[in-house]
Amino acid sequence: GVVTAINKAEEELANGGTLYCLGDIVHNSREVERLKEMGLITINHDDFNHLHDAKVLLRAHGEPPETYEIARRNNIEIIDATCPVVLRLQKKIKQEYTQKDTEDKQIVIYGKTGHAEVLGLVGQTTGEAIVIEKLEEAKKLDFTRSIRLYSQTTKSLDEFQKIVEYIK
């Protein structure tokens, strides 16, 4: 996902014009600096909300639906470098959230609160998903309701399995 984001940024910058990136494209200051020297401008969500008629790269972490809606309203062209694995996960969560059934369920995401990917996942549920960072937090879930558990793509499988076992 990260390699794709960098390649897309390089391609766009080679074509000339201004390219913004919503958040640091990677967690590597040297690479961020190199792309900045090529012309990439890193912005935050506040900057993005006030941007109009621009081209913005979305990094591998993914974004909530609200970001795409703002882009549409503000005539922002999106260069989407969201990792395909993250996109599939977002789609699964959104389907589960929007599926109308009689079951009273809660969507739970094992991940780091505030992490860009997790914000994108929670956004699929209009902010209703519950985020847990460790097994202890799973103990606070409402076990009278059905639980649908998902994980941030970069989290430990071992810890995820412990949470699954606890919930069972």
At which residue positions do the language-model features occur?
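The feature marks the mature, well-folded catalytic cores of soluble enzymes
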Residues: V2-K168
